[in-house]
Curated annotation (Swiss-Prot):
Positions with biased composition (Low complexity): 52-61
Domain PUB per the UniProt entry, residue ranges: 175-244
Domain UBX: 332-408
Protein name, per record: UBX domain-containing protein 6
Disordered: annotated segments: 13-111
Primary residence: cytoplasm
Keywords attached to this entry: Cytoplasm, Cytoskeleton, Endosome, Lysosome, Membrane, Nucleus, Phosphoprotein, Ubl conjugation pathway
This protein's domain notes: The UBX domain lacks key residues critical for VCP binding.
Pfam families hit by this protein: PUB (PF09409), UBX (PF00789)
Gene of this entry: Ubxn6
Protein's organism: Mus musculus (Mouse)
Amino acid sequence: MKKFFQEIKADIKFKSAGPGQKLTDSAGEKTTKGKSPQLALRQPRQGPTDEAQMAAAAALARLEQKQPRARGPTSQDSIRNQVRKELQAEATSSNNPGAPGTNSVPEPKEEISPHLAVPGVFFICPLTGVTLRRDQRDAHIKQAILSHFSTDPVAASIMKIHTFNRDRDRVKLGVDTIAKYLDNIHLHPEEEKYQKIKLQNKVFQERINCLEGSHEFFEAIGFKKVTLPVPDQEGQEEFYVLGEDARAQPQNLARHKQQLLDAEPVRATLDRQLRVFRPSALASHFELPSDFFSLTAEEVKREQRLRTEAVERLSSLRTKAMREKEEQRELRKYTYALVRVRLPDGCLLQGTFYAREKLSALFRFVREALQNDWLPFELRASGGQKLEENEALALNECGLVPSALLTFSWDASVLEDIRAAGAEPAKSVLRPELLAAIEQLS
């Protein structure tokens, strides 16, 4: 057996040793065909091929399936473990050119540009108000919900049910079933059978027991877990039994039921990162971090190259369906959008949005920054296209991704009425507290 694995390793090393040499070749021919010592030193050592490693792993798996499981380590186990360790070590050394013993130079890390329009995409926890990175938000929200149990266990358990369980259909089914239990208790307060819930009941097991937070909810609203005898059965089973205090206040059960039905998952909100800049010639220059893209920068370049080649080949043959498919692919490429709005005084208002957010969210963002938020205004894209405050259209559908510069103007008819009355709109349209934090765009 040991010889078998030695042969596998020898075969792997033989395949990676490079081209062979004939014994009849002259020294001159060997020198011509071979590489110089300096070049050989620069060439990193080649590890076993993927096919060879897979073959060795498959052989090990077949052998392990055929051999009965021993009670203790055997000599064959030791051999297999040793071979596996050696193969893994060789694979690691071949896949890690920067490891000691190799001559490869490690690739330099990508430097973050100091001129990014925003440092990244951030979120705000609705429970704590803490600003979070995307990779921090889920863990932080879970911890915040768990911490809430000490102050309001009912609300915390409801949040846990709706947030920790991702399958929305399963959550709805479980919540509706819990609501039915509570309805029966409220409608039939004298019926003792409705005040006990059998934990091994099929409906409870399939719809409720699988939901994180469901047990905490029952205990928080007054149920206690007890073991009771079951009629016509020898053993005992666990039940949730409504406590005396909860029975005396049935209106609380009705309130908790409605809270459970009306609740939504706790989600971090996107931080708009509202910023105001002085007038700048760099207003249309956007350097975005990788967070703004669904694909990595390398994947975006590759997709652009492939798309260019496809367009050149099929420019005269593309159908309407192909064009629509291409447009949909383009829309899905971006996750976020950075929008700047140039105001009448030249200042710039900047905010971060989801690429699929509606135009109404953009208009609301601008309106909340104005001194006179009751005055109607217009937003126009760089090509002069007027944007409508539409609940149906999203930013990516209007070409405002991954970044856009818009122009703000007051509604012309309203502006004429103001001037006809002998008044003029304020030169600065933004709220004073925003102007106090104005920055220089760089």
